[in-house]
């Protein structure tokens, strides 16, 4: 009887540990396809943000959207969602036009040069990027 109780307690502890570990890692948002481009967007909440940042190694381009706010001890980024994003190739063809669902967007693009535009409160920021297949992070930051 004593051995059975120990097994039951061990099994319960193992199940609780596994359950806690699974709860700490949020699932990735769904991958969406637009033409030849696969992307995902999200990162609202610490768990989802950590999950997306961990997955960034599998995407040649990661975008981050933030506004600089002034805190007591210096500027502090405030992450933004619902940011309209347009990616064009150098011929001006739109290869992706979407709105972010969180402060991070991971994009799989063919190798090449692209012009990326992101908008917040009517202010458009543009970046020219060379996608090589190696992971790259672009930060779009607006004044608050």
Question: Can you describe what each PLM-predicted range is?
Answer:
Residues 1-11:
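Bacterial N-terminal signal peptides that target proteins for export
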Residues 83-95:
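Short amphipathic beta-strand segments in non-cytosolic proteins
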Residues 90, 119-121:
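Short strand-coil-strand connectors
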Residues 102-108:
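Short, surface-exposed beta-strand/beta-hairpin micro-motifs centered on an aromatic residue
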Residues 112-118:
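A short tyrosine-centered beta-strand micro-motif
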């Amino acid at each position: 009887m004593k051995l059975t109780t120990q097994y039951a307690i061990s099994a319960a502890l193992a199940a609780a540990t596994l359950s806690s570990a699974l709860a700490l890692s949020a699932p990735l948002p769904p991958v969406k396809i637009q033409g030849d481009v696969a992307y995902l967007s999200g990162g609202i909440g610490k768990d989802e943000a950590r999950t997306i940042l961990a997955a960034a190694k599998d995407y040649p381009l990661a975008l981050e959207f933030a506004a600089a706010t002034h805190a007591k001890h210096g500027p502090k980024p405030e992450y933004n969602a619902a940011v309209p994003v347009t990616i064009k190739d150098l011929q001006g063809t739109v290869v992706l036009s979407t709105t972010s669902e969180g402060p991070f967007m991971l994009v799989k693009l063919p190798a090449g040069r692209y012009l990326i535009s992101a908008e917040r409160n009517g202010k458009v920021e543009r970046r020219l990027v060379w996608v090589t297949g190696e992971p790259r992070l672009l930060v779009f930051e607006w004044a608050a």
